[in-house]
């Protein structure tokens, strides 16, 4: 019987890197609302009292970037300079260029088939699904997301008014024979008001945030709870750490349970395969697992800049497949259009839906806008596999 520990982490919407992600995706949404064919690569930097907006944007949309940045910071809850940044008084610098014409000529010029739009860059992307949770997401990352999400809820509804926006979570699960067996360790670090004691923070976080989130069937023996291990977390947000778009790519995906191609998501329009192909990979993998064709599934897809057809597609099921990986790969090629424009059409991605993705995970969430979480091709795949 094999036994091991596996850990994943998440961060709250008030973490400085996530503040940057949400600003970038809020700007993307505002542009797509007016101009669905825009080319957007919106990067954000946050620091004490400062937001810098840079990148490449080609659009006909008329967008107030500074207002969007301030509104996003306000929505997150940074309305006091003592928290690390204040939406009312922070400086916002804007430095956008247009997309390079060298890139645009490979992305904009389609052949006879309008779906033959070239990829916006080279790269490799992964999608993953497993049967550890009803959402077909690995349990450690799913639990980590739910804990910081609950921290935000309790902060915003006033039940724990001393909570501040910045927080991190980390969950360690003991696995036996490849399946979650019990919860081993839970760590939460949360920003808080200066006048509350560490004992109060620890008791409230354990009782109000951690315990209500834990699956009862995995509580076996003592769980190690770690809350604010440094003893104090008053200085946080962009004051505690500089935040950058795209610096939480493992939090955004599978918590380290699957490989990552290295490309971030936030601030990028769907012509960027870093984002759209990763969403498509998740869609493919989730449908394979939902079809009962495997209990774990990894999909890799790769692209060349300016070329529509993927340079490779691979399916790996780690010995859990009901049919061979080669058969599954052919099923994917037969039933999913993985050209960039095909992905955009398949998942209806030219919509202002991205700000919601920028905190608490892009995957494993039951949101109506998240078309890549649908399992509408599971029955088709199962029938095509002869099961």
Swiss-Prot record:
Any one GO MF annotation of this record: magnesium ion binding
Keywords attached to this entry: ATP-binding, Cytoplasm, Magnesium, Metal-binding, Nucleotide-binding, One-carbon metabolism, Potassium, Transferase
Superkingdom, natural source: Bacteria
Cofactor requirement: Mg(2+); K(+)
Cofactor binding mode and count: Binds 2 divalent ions per subunit. Binds 1 potassium ion per subunit.
Keyword match Magnesium: yes
Pathway(s) annotated for this protein in UniProt: Amino-acid biosynthesis; S-adenosyl-L-methionine biosynthesis; S-adenosyl-L-methionine from L-methionine: step 1/1
Catalytic activity line of the entry: L-methionine + ATP + H2O = S-adenosyl-L-methionine + phosphate + diphosphate
GO cellular component, one term: cytoplasm
Keyword Magnesium: yes
Assembly description: Homotetramer; dimer of dimers.
Similarity annotation: Belongs to the AdoMet synthase family.
PANTHER family from the UniProt entry: S-ADENOSYLMETHIONINE SYNTHETASE
Functional summary from the UniProt entry: Catalyzes the formation of S-adenosylmethionine (AdoMet) from methionine and ATP. The overall synthetic reaction is composed of two sequential steps, AdoMet formation and the subsequent tripolyphosphate hydrolysis which occurs prior to release of AdoMet from the enzyme.
Protein name per its UniProtKB record: S-adenosylmethionine synthase
Protein species of origin: Methylobacillus flagellatus (strain ATCC 51484 / DSM 6875 / VKM B-1610 / KT)
Gene responsible for this protein: metK
């Amino acid at each position: 019987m094999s036994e091991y520990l596996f850990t994943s982490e998440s961060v709250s919407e008030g973490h400085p890197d996530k503040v940057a992600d949400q600003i970038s995706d809020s700007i993307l949404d505002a542009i797509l609302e007016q101009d669905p064919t825009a080319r957007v690569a919106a990067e954000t930097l946050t620091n004490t009292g400062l937001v810098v907006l840079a990148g490449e944007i080609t659009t006909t949309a008329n967008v107030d970037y500074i207002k969007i940045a301030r509104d996003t910071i306000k929505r997150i809850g940074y309305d006091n300079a003592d928290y690390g940044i204040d939406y009312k008084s922070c400086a916002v610098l804007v430095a956008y260029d247009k997309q390079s014409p060298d890139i645009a000529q490979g992305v904009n010029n389609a052949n006879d088939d309008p779906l033959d739009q070239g990829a916006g860059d080279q790269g490799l992307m992964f999608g993953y699904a497993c049967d550890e949770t009803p959402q077909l997401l690995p349990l450690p990352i799913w639990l980590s997301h739910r804990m910081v999400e609950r921290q935000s809820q309790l902060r915003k509804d006033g039940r724990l008014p001393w909570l501040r926006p910045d927080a991190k979570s980390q969950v360690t699960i003991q696995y036996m024979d490849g399946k979650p067996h019990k919860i081993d360790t839970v760590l939460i670090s949360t920003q808080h008001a200066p006048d509350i004691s560490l004992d109060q923070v620890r008791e409230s976080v354990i009782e109000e945030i951690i315990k209500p989130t834990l699956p009862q069937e995995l509580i076996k023996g003592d769980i190690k709870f770690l809350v604010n291990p440094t003893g104090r977390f008053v200085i946080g947000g962009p004051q505690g750490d500089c935040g950058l778009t795209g610096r939480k790519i493992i939090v955004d995906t599978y918590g380290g349970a699957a490989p990552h191609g290295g490309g971030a998501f936030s601030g990028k329009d769907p012509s960027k395969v870093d984002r759209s192909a990763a969403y498509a990979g998740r869609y493919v993998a989730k449908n394979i697992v939902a079809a009962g064709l495997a209990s774990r599934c990894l999909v890799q897809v790769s692209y060349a800049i300016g070329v529509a057809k993927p340079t490779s597609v691979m399916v790996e099921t780690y010995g859990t497949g009901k049919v061979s990986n080669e058969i599954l790969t052919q099923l994917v090629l037969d039933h999913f259009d993985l050209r960039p424009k095909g992905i955009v059409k398949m998942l209806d991605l030219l919509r202002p839906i991205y700000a919601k993705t920028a905190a608490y995970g892009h995957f494993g969430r039951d949101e109506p806008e998240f078309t890549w979480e649908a399992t509408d091709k599971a029955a088709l795949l199962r029938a095509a596999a002869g099961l």
